[in-house]
From Swiss-Prot:
<dbReference type="Pfam" id="PF00551">
    <property type="entry name" value="Formyl_trans_N"/>
</dbReference>
<dbReference type="Pfam" id="PF02911">
    <property type="entry name" value="Formyl_trans_C"/>
</dbReference>
<dbReference type="GO" id="GO:0005829">
    <property type="term" value="C:cytosol"/>
</dbReference>
<dbReference type="InterPro" id="IPR011034">
    <property type="entry name" value="Formyl_transferase-like_C_sf"/>
</dbReference>
<dbReference type="InterPro" id="IPR005794">
    <property type="entry name" value="Fmt"/>
</dbReference>
<dbReference type="InterPro" id="IPR041711">
    <property type="entry name" value="Met-tRNA-FMT_N"/>
</dbReference>
<dbReference type="InterPro" id="IPR005793">
    <property type="entry name" value="Formyl_trans_C"/>
</dbReference>
<comment type="similarity">
    <text>Belongs to the Fmt family.</text>
</comment>
<dbReference type="InterPro" id="IPR044135">
    <property type="entry name" value="Met-tRNA-FMT_C"/>
</dbReference>
<dbReference type="GO" id="GO:0004479">
    <property type="term" value="F:methionyl-tRNA formyltransferase activity"/>
</dbReference>
<comment type="function">
    <text>Attaches a formyl group to the free amino group of methionyl-tRNA(fMet). The formyl group appears to play a dual role in the initiator identity of N-formylmethionyl-tRNA by promoting its recognition by IF2 and preventing the misappropriation of this tRNA by the elongation apparatus.</text>
</comment>
<protein>
    <recommendedName>
        <fullName>Methionyl-tRNA formyltransferase</fullName>
        <ecNumber>2.1.2.9</ecNumber>
    </recommendedName>
</protein>
<dbReference type="InterPro" id="IPR001555">
    <property type="entry name" value="GART_AS"/>
</dbReference>
<dbReference type="InterPro" id="IPR002376">
    <property type="entry name" value="Formyl_transf_N"/>
</dbReference>
<keyword id="KW-0808">Transferase</keyword>
<dbReference type="InterPro" id="IPR036477">
    <property type="entry name" value="Formyl_transf_N_sf"/>
</dbReference>
<keyword id="KW-0648">Protein biosynthesis</keyword>
Length: 309
């Protein structure tokens, strides 16, 4: 089976590696153009491009996937399947219609829930107890195509978006492997999504990390996990931005105004919310590294009675 692979960030790398390991004929890899990276702003390759070059696979980097020249190139390759994993551009109908056996997408949610750009973050922010990977046949909509396979994953109440991202990379690759096997055999299932049950996972932005202490301790805990490592949760302490990296919901209440620092100890900062007390265990002050509160207070003071935010 001849495959064209389209993907860009590190979450797509295990999927490409799995296709290489399974000895499919890879006609080419399509990835986003090189971008300036680091302080020197030198052009850097995407993780997918690096893997392709290591394996002597031709690489294509269209600025726009709808350009006629690029579409003609993919047509000339004549793939049986196009596999898309976090490519970063919307594919036009002309490309979706090229492969004989379809364009296959690996999406890191249990569709139709959490369509869109940031499902890993939003399942945690919303306090979901499970998520998963869905493979599907692509159509012109945003993650609306017919589903092939699903793999469910239970969510620990303390898992962060970064940890879940790393977990899903490998689960996605295994689900893709099974999907491609079924497609090659002609046995791939095809299930229409229930479009009435959909939800969206919009792209993340920095303001999402701003903690609102008038919410429940559990909601704040979920936010802190869901925006870790990016865009990261934050509040203000004495008019200075304080990033919040790790929290715990305590089985105790407070009558203080929301956001009030109730107590500071080696265990962390106790803060009042609309219901339970939230323990902030790890913070980061401007121009400093991340630190457990117990370490930070050895050389710095955090005052009780002050209100965060």
């Amino acid at each position: 089976m001849k495959i064209v692979f389209m993907g860009t960030p590190d979450i797509a790398v295990p999927c490409l590696q799995k296709i290489i390991d399974e000895n499919y004929e890879i006609l080419g890899v399509v990835t986003q153009p090189d971008k300036p990276k680091g302080r020197g702003k030198k052009l850097g390759m995407s993780p997918v491009k690096e893997l392709a070059i290591e394996n002597n696979i031709p690489v294509y980097q269209p600025v726009k996937a709808r350009d006629k020249e690029f579409i003609d190139k993919i047509k000339s390759l004549n793939p049986d399947v196009i596999v898309v994993v976090a490519f970063g551009q919307i594919l036009p109908k002309e490309i979706l219609e090229i492969p004989k056996l379809g364009c296959i997408n690996v999406h890191v949610s249990l569709l139709p829930k959490y369509r869109g750009a940031a499902p890993i973050n939003w399942v945690i922010i919303n306090g979901e107890e499970k998520t998963g990977v869905t493979t599907m046949y692509m159509d012109e909509g945003l993650d609306t195509g017919d589903m092939i396979l699903k793999t469910e994953v239970n969510l620990d109440e303390n898992i962060t978006a970064g940890e879940l991202h790393d977990k899903m990379m490998n689960i996605g690759a295994e689900t893709l492997k099974e999907t491609l096997r079924l497609i090659e055999e002609g046995n791939a299932p095809r299930e229409v999504q229930n479009h009435e049950e959909f939800s969206y996972a919009p792209i993340m932005n920095k303001s999402l990390g701003n903690i609102d202490f008038s919410k429940s301790a559990r909601e704040i805990h979920n936010l802190v996990r869901g925006v870790n490592p990016w865009p990261s949760a934050y509040t203000t302490y004495n008019d200075v931005i304080m990033k919040v990296w790790k929290t715990k919901v305590l089985d105790e209440k407070s009558t203080k105004d929301v956001g009030t620092i109730i107590d500071v100890s080696k265990d962390g900062i106790k803060v009042s919310t609309i219901d339970n007390v939230l323990l902030i265990e790890e913070i980061q002050m401007p121009n400093k590294k991340r630190m457990l509160v117990g370490e930070y207070i050895k050389g710095n003071t955090i005052e009780t009675g002050l209100v965060l935010g």
